[in-house]
Structures are given as C-alpha cells and as structure tokens.
Amino acid sequence: MARIAGVDIPKNERVEIGLTRIFGIGRSLSNKILKETGVEPNKRVKDLTDDEIVKIRSEIEKNYKVEGELRKEISMNIKRLMDIGCYRGLRHMANLPVRGQRTRTNSRTRKGPRRKIMKKK
C-alpha cells in the first residue's frame, strides 16, 4: 500500500482511481496531478516506483489542500458565516437547507427524523 497525504491507497487499484481516495481529490484533479508528475494513469499502485510515489506526494503537498487541511478550511468557512450572522450562517445554525430548497415538505435529511406529537384527547 502506498501512503499519500496520510491515506493508504490499495495496491491493486489504478493510480488515477487510487488518488481519489484522498479527500479533496476527484478524477479530474487526479488526472491533472498524474500529468504534471509524468506518471501513467493506468498503472497499478503496486507497480509504482518509490521515485514516482515521492513525486506524486510532493506535487500534492506543494499545490493542493487535501484531507485535514481542507476539512479545517471548510469548517472555518461555515463558522465564519455563522459568526457574521448572514442568512446562510443562520440556516447552518438552524440545521436547515442552506441553498434555497423548499422546507414545507422534503428536507428530511437536513432536519432529521420527524418528531412525534402527542394527540389531544
């Protein structure tokens, strides 16, 4: 297993797919990284040389925010919205949909399960 950005990448996966295991790297970014480092995308992770792994690792560390650093930035952005009290921040605080979806029906994922209300007798 190759370890890149703190993530173990399975040996038998293709490199372009294996890199997508890292939070913040999708297929297009994975292909871009491999093109910049000169590594064949269809190569299996087990066939990579140590030099190629070091190239990929240094390219990611140098140019991209991934894993913990990216998660921290996202959470800080949400916290900033909540601190300034803007509409999006208020929606985050209330655990409601942030991007304008309807809430009269739907939005159960964001609101959580329905709460039971006792019937009047």
Curated annotation (Swiss-Prot):
Disordered: region residues:
99-121
Q: Where is the composition biased (Basic residues)?
A: 101-121
Q: Which GO terms describe its cellular component?
A: cytosol; small ribosomal subunit
- Which biological process terms from the Gene Ontology are attached to this UniProt entry? translation
Keywords recorded for this protein, A-Z = Ribonucleoprotein, Ribosomal protein, RNA-binding, rRNA-binding, tRNA-binding
The entry lists its GO molecular-function terms as: rRNA binding; structural constituent of ribosome; tRNA binding
Extract the Pfam families matched here. Ribosomal_S13 (PF00416)
Q: Which family does it belong to?
A: Belongs to the universal ribosomal protein uS13 family.
The protein's matches in PANTHER family, at most eight in alphabetical order, are given as: 30S RIBOSOMAL PROTEIN S13/40S RIBOSOMAL PROTEIN S18 (PTHR10871), SMALL RIBOSOMAL SUBUNIT PROTEIN US13M (PTHR10871:SF1)
* Function description: Located at the top of the head of the 30S subunit, it contacts several helices of the 16S rRNA. In the 70S ribosome it contacts the 23S rRNA (bridge B1a) and protein L5 of the 50S subunit (bridge B1b), connecting the 2 subunits; these bridges are implicated in subunit movement. Contacts the tRNAs in the A and P-sites.
Self-association or partners: how does it assemble?
Part of the 30S ribosomal subunit. Forms a loose heterodimer with protein S19. Forms two bridges to the 50S subunit in the 70S ribosome.
Q: What is this protein called?
A: Small ribosomal subunit protein uS13
| Organism whose genome encodes this protein | Thermodesulfovibrio yellowstonii (strain ATCC 51303 / DSM 11347 / YP87)
Gene for this protein?
rpsM
